[in-house]
């Protein structure tokens, strides 16, 4: 189990990403727009840099929702590989069976 502080940190990052997503997209659109003046694009770049670092989606880390494990996480389920296997073996995930060939 990951430390609670790490899980809370990731939750805080997720909240910040959600909060600043619109503002960030707006500023990026101005920066990418070639028809805008160079000065206006520069101002948008400065405003983008002034946003909190943790509001960038690249700083998020996928973690298991049950254990907080940062590696081996399946995005589709939001679970780590270990917990995914345990739950699948109990038959709690519809349609998921152990592979055999």
From Swiss-Prot:
One of its GO terms (molecular function) is structural constituent of ribosome. One of its GO terms (biological process) is translation. The keyword Transcription regulation does not apply. Keywords: Ribonucleoprotein, Ribosomal protein, RNA-binding, rRNA-binding. The keyword rRNA processing does not apply. Disulfide bonds: none annotated. InterPro entries: Ribosomal_uS14 (IPR001209), Ribosomal_uS14_bac/plastid (IPR023036). Binds 16S rRNA, required for the assembly of 30S particles and may also be responsible for determining the conformation of the 16S rRNA at the A site. Belongs to the universal ribosomal protein uS14 family. NCBIfam families: PRK08881.1. This is Small ribosomal subunit protein uS14. It comes from Janthinobacterium sp. (strain Marseille).
């Amino acid at each position: 189990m990951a430390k609670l502080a790490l899980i809370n940190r990731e939750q805080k990052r997720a909240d910040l990403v959600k909060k600043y997503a619109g503002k960030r997209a707006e500023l990026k659109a101005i920066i990418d727009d070639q028809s805008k003046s160079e000065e206006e694009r520069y101002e948008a770049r400065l405003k983008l840099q002034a946003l909190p670092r943790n509001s960038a989606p690249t700083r998020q880390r996928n973690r298991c929702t049950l254990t907080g494990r940062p590696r081996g996480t399946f995005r589709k389920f939001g679970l780590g590989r270990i917990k995914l296997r345990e739950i699948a073996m109990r038959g709690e995930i519809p349609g998921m069976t152990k592979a055999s060939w």
